[in-house]
Amino acid sequence: MVNVIMKISSLKKGSNFSINIKNIKLDKKLLVAIIFLVLSILGGGAYLYYENEKTKKLEQARLQKIQKENSDKQTYLSDFKSAFEGLDYQALTGFYDVLRSDIDFFRVNNWLLDVMDCNVNCNLAFKRGSFDTFTYLEMNRNGAVIKPQFDQNKLQFANVDYISGFRSIYLKDLTEQERDKSENIIEQCSTKLSELYNLQLLMKEQVKFKINLPRNVTSISGYDWVKNSDIKFGSIEIENMPEKNLGLMKNIMNNSMMITSISLQNSSFKSKLNYYCY
């Protein structure tokens, strides 16, 4: 507005020179504004391009992470199976506890580690802790303790400190009461398995023994394992049990178990039991 008034005033005085100067100054300002506008557009375009590339890189990193996790999972499961295959089991009850250091990792990643299969000279020996629950198991072969094997170069959680890290990252939002509740779920399911104590007598008879652990306990997605802690089902499969030991089944059965199938062949029988815990 000031420039316009100055132009009118200069016109009244008849100073064409003054008018031309004013017009030149006005054109420079307009040019600066146009340049600024162009730079703004270019800058905005560059920013959008940068954000788009950044989004692409993040998505690529996410997909690579998923691919690596899937690869790690298959590697671990393969090594896990090979580590347990053909072992002479000295005990069953600590199966949870051998994996207890991994359980949070499994929960977070929703991995399926829920089957224990023993086909060679199975011998169950339960080690009980306080309140009739077990707290410990060691699996021995040739006198040495066996634990699941995995490639420490491929799996990030091979570090001994990973457990506290995962707990602090993934379980930090859980209240103390919820954490206690989650532990109780595992303890209760584990206690149900400890009812199989009497099977240790049968395992000396080359009985094949397979336990399908409760899937919703050993394989959990997010925090649903805390919120949806309803009944968890598992199953136990027994083969080659001598007919003479059939009476021992009554020591296995309790209110939380039911036989779903049973068959007899060559003086031995095969059966499947379902069990559950709350």
Curated annotation (Swiss-Prot):
The gene is tcpD. Involved in TCP pilus biogenesis. GO terms for cellular component: plasma membrane. It comes from the Bacteria. Its main location: membrane. The chain crosses the membrane at residues 30-50. Keywords: Cell membrane, Membrane, Transmembrane, Transmembrane helix. It is found in: Cell membrane. It comes from Vibrio cholerae serotype O1 (strain ATCC 39315 / El Tor Inaba N16961). The keyword Membrane applies. It is a single-pass membrane protein. This is Toxin coregulated pilus biosynthesis protein D.
